C-alpha cells in the first residue's frame, strides 16, 4: 500500500529514478494500490533526460510489496519493491520501455498500451 511520503522506484526510461508520493488522485482512500494514479515529486533523476529532479509528475503504480489477490485463480502475487511509471495527463506513457514485470490487472482497467511496451506481463 502506498501512502503519502512513500518512496517508489521508477520502472521506465523517462529519466526519473526515485519518486515520492505527495497525493493520491484516483481514489479517496488514504492509500493506493496497483493500478492507482498518484501525484509525485522526483527525488532522483538521471542527467540529460526529459524528467528532472524536483519536478511534479503523475505516476501509475505497477508494483507493490503488499500482496495482490487474483480472483480468477485464487492466488496472491507480491513484488519485492514498490514501483511506478511516469504518465502524461492523458494517461499515456512518457517513457518507451517498462522494466520488470507488470500485472495483467492493469490491462483490465484501461491501460492497454502497457501491453506493447512491457517486457513481462504476469
UniProtKB/Swiss-Prot annotation:
InterPro entries: Ribosomal_uL14, Ribosomal_uL14_bac-type, Ribosomal_uL14_sf. Keywords: Plastid, Ribonucleoprotein, Ribosomal protein, RNA-binding, rRNA-binding. One of its GO terms (molecular function) is structural constituent of ribosome. Its main location: plastid. GO terms for biological process: translation. GO terms for cellular component: cytosolic large ribosomal subunit; plastid. It is found in: Plastid. Part of the 50S ribosomal subunit. Belongs to the universal ribosomal protein uL14 family. HAMAP family: Ribosomal_uL14. PANTHER family: 50S/60S RIBOSOMAL PROTEIN L14/L23 (PTHR11761), LARGE RIBOSOMAL SUBUNIT PROTEIN UL14M (PTHR11761:SF3). Binds to 23S rRNA. NCBIfam families: rplN_bact. This is Large ribosomal subunit protein uL14c.
Amino acid at each position: 500500500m502506498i501512502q503519502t511520503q512513500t518512496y517508489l522506484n521508477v520502472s521506465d526510461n523517462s529519466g526519473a529514478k526515485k519518486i515520492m508520493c505527495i497525493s493520491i488522485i484516483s481514489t479517496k482512500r488514504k492509500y493506493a494500490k496497483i493500478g492507482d494514479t498518484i501525484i509525485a515529486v522526483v527525488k532522483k533523476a538521471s542527467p540529460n533526460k526529459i524528467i528532472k529532479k524536483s519536478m511534479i509528475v503523475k505516476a501509475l503504480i505497477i508494483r507493490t510489496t503488499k500482496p495482490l489477490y487474483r480472483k480468477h485463480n485464487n492466488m496472491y502475487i507480491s513484488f519485492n519493491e514498490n514501483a511506478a511509471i511516469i504518465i502524461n495527463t492523458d494517461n499515456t506513457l512518457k517513457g518507451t520501455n517498462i522494466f520488470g514485470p507488470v500485472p495483467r490487472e492493469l490491462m483490465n482497467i484501461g491501460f492497454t498500451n502497457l501491453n506493447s511496451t512491457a517486457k513481462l506481463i504476469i
